[in-house]
């Protein structure tokens, strides 16, 4: 720690935190602008530098016991310059996961170790332009701007609700007049007038109620469409790391939670809230009739609320358990359907069925517990309602007998009380839905609150030439995961064909993911034509990079649509030319529908080799300046591979080509071969040059394949 003042760890921390939030940062520029005296970034200059990157930063003082309530990662600032990044807090285990800026590695600290390092100063960081900022966080407050946006429609709904409540107030008064005046004085003419008036009120009440439901459903449907569109756009904008760290079933289950929110918005819950808001009008009239009976109704309302509050935490836990089990089932189902060929080939259907039965039984049991608890909650509400009814009947009868209240007034009072209690009971009975929606919002927030790939402020540069430079690259997938690439320095010239080989797990594919800007390195820069990819628009880059993987996915469309996926308006001639280069034209021509043949889900209607050749054509059709083959020919038969290799000269012409291969014969004609081992470049040269070194790793791998 004594050497901390010699190195500017604040600058390094800013670089890491900016990259975490997908914000471009140039360390040299930051140092030039804010480290004017060359002593490193002080606290004030660090905050200014962060704000210049459009980061939302706030310095706070927090005791250790409050750290599990803050948004992480955050920078722990120390006076001696030995800052570190706090990434995770486990209060149960009293452990803290930090990123040690000095060691450039994650560390797990015990409580005593952390207390020795923590000085109480911490800097909270969020991206202003991304959904990680507090103002953009998806929770119940997200609906407030949506309501404001459609405020005109909601005001119309409120106006209609006012008239509905007035009509609901008139009806009990008519009944009171009939009971106390018409029946006593046998006033048939008055009865006829009241009947006609009541009929008019009923007709208008039905019309207004239907109109309110229509207006409300229309507005909530628009909010639903807006949320659904936002969700899908955000999902596609998430970085690759989000999907690689989660099961497909989990993501699908979270997206499906939108259905719960939709049902809640279009249900009776919100209209019940509106009805409840106008209850003060009824209370005023009820108080006029009988303060004693009104107090009984008033005192019952806290009972409804208390019972619901008592039930809700237990219900929420059980709903959470139900969701988790449903997500497990969803993941297992997706996995089983995806791996159906393996399951059938290995005859493990009974094992999979047993696992499914156990998981399904757990889900059904969790759902049964939710139903039982919800039933208990509803019966408790019914008990309160019946008890209040009995008390009102007894007390109301006493008031009528004593002459303090007429029979008509008692009937009118009970009708008015029903107008108040009915929405309360409805709200209490749908409390389960509200708890479910709360969980749905939280689960959906896992998607919508995850930072997307940053496009704001990125550079859309001119057409690239193909020069690629890796400069001092250090990379790991997660802060607590092993280093995948370590001190990579590599220059690839425009038009050069590079082969990358090595054992599995040596970092070959990771290197190409950095070229596509799927990830930003922990340290160092990836440059194309001298431009730092951290500052470049990902879409601009990926449109000019063609990639063919070992396992490519085709969409359930025609062959021509799959090949021209990135540019649907492309001419048929260009599609056919790309297919010929990929060796796919001949087999496509033999199909009954030719290029209009639907390939099926994930290309299920084609063989593995055919799918691979279409994927190669898809990568070539846009004439990319950089072409990456990641084990692209390993799934091809020898005849198809021969066609590809025969056309390789045409494929590589005018492009920078990177070929990753375990089959060394694929790269022996490359301009240069890069050999990787444990995340480092250990050898490079031409095929014959590498074989001339008998002790080299390349020679060893080549000898194994020759044998």
UniProtKB/Swiss-Prot annotation:
Q: Which residues form the ABC transporter domain?
A: 468-703
Query: Is Transferase a UniProt keyword of this protein?
Result: no
SMART domains, alphabetized = AAA (SM00382)
What top-level branch of life does the organism fall under? Bacteria
Q: Where are the transmembrane segments?
A: 158-178, 191-211, 269-289, 295-315, 388-408
Stored SUPFAM superfamilies? ABC transporter transmembrane region, P-loop containing nucleoside triphosphate hydrolases
* Record domain Peptidase C39: where: 3-125
Residue span, ABC transmembrane type-1 domain: 154-436
Question: Which residues are named in the active-site annotation?
Answer: 83
> Anything else of interest in the record?
The complex HlyBD-TolC (OMF) forms a single transport channel across the two membranes, allowing direct export of alpha-hemolysin. These channel is involved in type 1 secretion system.
Give the NCBIfam families listed for this entry: type_I_sec_HlyB (TIGR01846)
The family line of this record is: Belongs to the ABC transporter superfamily. Protein-1 exporter (TC 3.A.1.109) family.
Assembly behavior: Homodimer.
Give the domain note.
In HlyB the peptidase C39 domain, the ATP-binding domain (NBD) and the transmembrane domain (TMD) are fused.
Q: What is this protein called?
A: Alpha-hemolysin translocation ATP-binding protein HlyB
State the taxonomy lineage.
Bacteria, Pseudomonadati, Pseudomonadota, Gammaproteobacteria, Enterobacterales
Question: What's the encoding gene here?
Answer: hlyB
